[in-house]
Amino acid sequence: EDLRTPGLDKLLWVFLRLLYSHQGLTRFLDETDATALEKQIDKLEQRRSKLVQGNERLRKSLTDAIATTGMRLENLRNAERNAEFVSLELDRIQSKILALSEMAVNNQSPDFITSQVDAVAAGMAETESAIKELNYITGLGETLEEAPSILERSI
């Protein structure tokens, strides 16, 4: 049967974008060391506490360095939460795709399968919102927000 629908294209497109986001998040998390950032903050705070009165230029510089490193640490924490969400969403969508595939194998009504695909695709709003927030990692930007026609051939 022909199961090509915009809903299936959307489902597959979201899955591919999540895979790409997951790859970027994983690479970022592998390359960023929270312990090193925490140690850097401690060292900077120690240096600042040892400054003598009247050395405001150095104090401002160290304060800014502490704030910047703190932002990097917070960004790392956000990336950890995002990676967990993306991983859960990948598992969830993969399960949905498998369930839809199993329905198709069991020769259920194409109209029923299409309605199920469309229902799953319609429930992707939160996932798509998360993907938009992760555009800085995916590099996909706004240009490919709409799902392309992924399935151009009959299944």
Regions found by a protein language model. Give the residues of each.
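Long amphipathic all-alpha helical oligomerization modules
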Residues: 51-155
